[in-house]
């Protein structure tokens, strides 16, 4: 990529138009890793110049989503910095952009356009009807003198400010993700984009570029959907006479089937949804780092420190990444298994509290019990949000949806009732109530009853948990305790007796 001169400064500049897309988190992450790798600064800036699409509260949501993943900024809207404010609407109110608009008008690189939306639509329709494949608007006012433009504006007629694009030659830039490849656009294929709306609000193309210059941004890492807009940005840098930042356009993330990009409209890709479902920040951080970047082609599990050390743009692939929810789920499971018991207990506590199983925060007794239960699901858990369903029967009484679930293979209602009665009788006097004693007594009971372990253990499992699949049986019985175990065995026996009718002798 070449030697970087001076301190690296990058930015992530989302628009508060709703929840933060997971692809946006990936873009922020690549910026953050690049800055940290080079000992530079990562800046967060809110670009809210699109008043129609602005969603109140979404700026707070996107900051919370970034912080959840572990992305902190060195300058930003909530912590300030030397180039505050870091919200474009506030910068507009402060009059930051107006002098630069005047500079473009004075130099002839921009002009006031008085063409209305209705006129523009009519011109577009006529051009397309005439066989033009792509309508490229260049307003008649581009040839007016600035004095004439100002005279028209003085009459009160609404206007936008447009960039006066050249009609000949090419506009080019180099892209670091493509190995510094020179990307060219023929100027005749450009059009005069709007820089300032009729409301006076600057649009993204102008506002972000002025902000990048004033905030001394050295590298612009952004989605490759902005490649087509980059020639306009290059023309603006040239018009101002400013040094351009280095550009790196990141590959899109496709759906798992490869049919199109991940989309807010059709895919469950809100960053906060992964938070709510119980993905660990470290797992999401690791997985997103691999969405378009690879260290050596096979190493996948890497710590934040390793990713910072290894991340370089020459390892970012220009071809699209592909979203794989199963791989993310597996990676989350790996990170969950790396947690210590108390760490996992504390991580799942909010999910159990949300389900009404424990308090928020849990009492000391609740936390101690949760620490006891956590090893029972530690190896099985892939999302923290699965914990309430897996552990619910430890906190609430069991209601059998169908007593016939108690009956195991090659058993009937009568033998199942008898087995439950025998288990209750065998366990009632048992002391101490430990894993080894429970296993020894119940295995001995299997032999006495002529049952296979799976038959007796399966019936007991359903009786005490209400489900056919549950954590290891003897650990479960220890965690439930003697009194609850015996009570549930008796309740299950009674339920099956009632359900099966008079043919079952108690």
Swiss-Prot record:
One of its GO terms (biological process) is glutamyl-tRNA aminoacylation. The keyword Cytoplasm applies. Its main location: cytoplasm. ATP binds at residue 264. CDD domains: GluRS_core (cd00808). GO terms for molecular function: ATP binding; glutamate-tRNA ligase activity; tRNA binding; zinc ion binding. It comes from the Bacteria. Keywords: Aminoacyl-tRNA synthetase, ATP-binding, Cytoplasm, Ligase, Nucleotide-binding, Protein biosynthesis. It catalyses: tRNA(Glu) + L-glutamate + ATP = L-glutamyl-tRNA(Glu) + AMP + diphosphate. GO terms for cellular component: cytosol. Pfam families: Anticodon_2, tRNA-synt_1c. InterPro entries: aa-tRNA-synth_I_cd-bd, aa-tRNA-synth_I_codon-bd_sub2, aa-tRNA-synth_I_CS, aa_tRNA-synth_I_cd-bd_sf, Glu-tRNA-ligase_bac/mito, Glu-tRNA-synth_I_codon-bd_sub1, Glu/Gln-tRNA-synth, Glu/Gln-tRNA-synth_Ib_cat-dom. Its EC number is 6.1.1.17. SUPFAM superfamilies: An anticodon-binding domain of class I aminoacyl-tRNA synthetases, Nucleotidylyl transferase. It is found in: Cytoplasm. The keyword Lipid biosynthesis does not apply. A motif ('KMSKS' region) lies at residues 261-265. NCBIfam families: gltX_bact. Monomer. Catalyzes the attachment of glutamate to tRNA(Glu) in a two-step reaction: glutamate is first activated by ATP to form Glu-AMP and then transferred to the acceptor end of tRNA(Glu). PANTHER family: GLUTAMATE--TRNA LIGASE, GLUTAMATE--TRNA LIGASE, MITOCHONDRIAL-RELATED. This is Glutamate--tRNA ligase. It comes from Roseiflexus sp. (strain RS-1).
């Amino acid at each position: 990529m070449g030697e970087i001169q001076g301190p690296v400064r990058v930015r992530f500049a989302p628009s508060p138009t709703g929840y933060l897309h997971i692809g946006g988190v990936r873009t922020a992450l690549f910026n953050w890793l690049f800055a940290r790798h080079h000992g530079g600064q990562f800046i967060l800036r809110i670009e809210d110049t699109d008043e129609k699409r602005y969603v109140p509260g979404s700026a707070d949501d996107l900051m919370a989503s970034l912080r959840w993943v572990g992305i902190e900024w060195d300058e930003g809207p909530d912590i300030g910095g030397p180039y505050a404010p870091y919200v474009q609407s506030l910068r507009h109110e402060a009059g930051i952009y107006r002098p630069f608009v005047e500079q473009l008008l004075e130099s002839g690189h921009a002009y006031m356009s008085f063409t209305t939306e209705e006129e523009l639509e009519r011109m577009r329709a006529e051009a397309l009807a005439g066989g033009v494949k792509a309508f490229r608007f260049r307003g008649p006012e581009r040839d007016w003198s600035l004095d004439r433009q100002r005279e028209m504006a003085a009459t009160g007629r609404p206007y936008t400010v447009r960039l006066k694009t050249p009609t000949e030659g090419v506009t080019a830039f180099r892209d670091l993700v493509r190995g510094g490849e020179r990307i060219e656009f023929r100027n005749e294929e450009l059009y005069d984009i709007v820089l300032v709306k009729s409301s006076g609000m600057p649009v993204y193309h102008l506002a972000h570029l002025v902000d990048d210059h004033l905030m001394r941004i050295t590298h612009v890492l952004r989605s490759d959907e902005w490649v087509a807009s980059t020639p306009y940005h290059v023309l603006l840098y040239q018009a101002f006479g400013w040094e351009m930042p280095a550009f790196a356009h990141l590959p899109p993330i496709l759906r798992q089937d490869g049919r199109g990009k991940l989309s807010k409209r059709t895919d469950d890709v809100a960053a906060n949804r992964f938070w709510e479902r119980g993905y660990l920040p470290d797992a999401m951080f690791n997985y997103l780092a691999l969405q378009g970047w690879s260290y050596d082609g096979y190493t996948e599990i890497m710590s934040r420190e390793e990713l910072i050390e290894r991340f370089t743009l020459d390892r970012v692939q220009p071809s699209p990444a592909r979203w794989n929810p199963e791989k993310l789920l597996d990676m989350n499971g790996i990170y969950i298994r790396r947690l210590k018991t108390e760490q996992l207990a504390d991580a799942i506590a909010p999910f159990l509290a949300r389900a009404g199983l424990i308090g928020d925060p849990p009492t000391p007794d609740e936390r101690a019990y949760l620490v006891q239960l956590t090893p029972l699901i530690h190896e099985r858990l892939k999302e923290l949000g699965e914990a309430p369903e897996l552990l619910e029967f430890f906190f609430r009484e069991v209601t059998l949806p169908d007593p016939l679930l108690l009956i195991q293979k090659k058993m009937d209602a009568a033998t199942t009732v008898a087995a439950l009665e025998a288990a209750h009788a065998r366990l009632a006097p048992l002391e101490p109530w430990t894993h080894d004693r429970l296993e020894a007594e119940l295995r001995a009971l299997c032999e006495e009853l002529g049952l296979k372990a799976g038959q007796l253990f399966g019936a007991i499992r359903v009786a005490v948990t209400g489900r056919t699949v549950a954590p290891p049986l003897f650990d479960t019985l220890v965690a439930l305790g003697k009194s609850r175990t015996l009570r549930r065995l008796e309740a299950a026996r009674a339920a099956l007796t009632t359900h099966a009718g008079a043919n079952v002798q108690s």
